[in-house]
From Swiss-Prot:
Stretches the record annotates as Disordered: 52-71
Chain segments annotated as transmembrane: none
Lineage, top ranks: Bacteria, Bacillati, Bacillota, Bacilli, Lactobacillales
Entries under NCBIfam families matching the protein: PRK13676.1-1
Gene3D superfamilies in the record: YheA/YmcA-like
Listed Pfam families: Com_YlbF
Compositionally biased intervals (Polar residues): 52-63
Record's protein name: UPF0342 protein SAG1376
Length: 111
């Protein structure tokens, strides 16, 4: 029987070889080479982190913060590079979700 760690490493290499994974890498590289997209990306990451911290501490964003997030979302949607990135991320997430279901199926048997 194959070593489970060897199989996990093989899966990791297979995921990295997926065209969808490569498309996300290409889209990420395009963002990194465009100053405007990079600023929007950094704003998105900072806002996402702030909202996650608020939610974890039981707080909800104020109306002003929600409006700011909405405006940022509109800017992101209007940036072609970021739009492509998020579209490619979504395609990759379908694979990752399917893989997660398969990998964690034995754990469900124990519940």
């Amino acid at each position: 029987m194959a070593n489970v760690y060897d199989l996990a490493n093989e899966l990791e290499r297979a995921v990295r070889a997926l065209p969808e994974y490569q498309a996300v890498l290409t889209a990420k590289s395009a963002i990194e080479s465009d100053a405007d997209a990079q600023v929007l990306w950094q704003d998105f990451l900072a806002t996402q982190s702030k909202v996650q911290e608020m939610m974890q501490s039981g707080q909800m964003p104020s109306q002003e913060e929600q409006d700011e997030m909405s405006k940022l979302g509109e800017k992101i949607e209007s940036n072609d590079l970021l739009k492509v990135y998020f579209d490619q991320q979504q395609r990759l997430s379908v694979y990752m979700s399917d893989i997660e279901k398969i990998v964690f199926a034995p754990m469900q048997d124990l519940m």
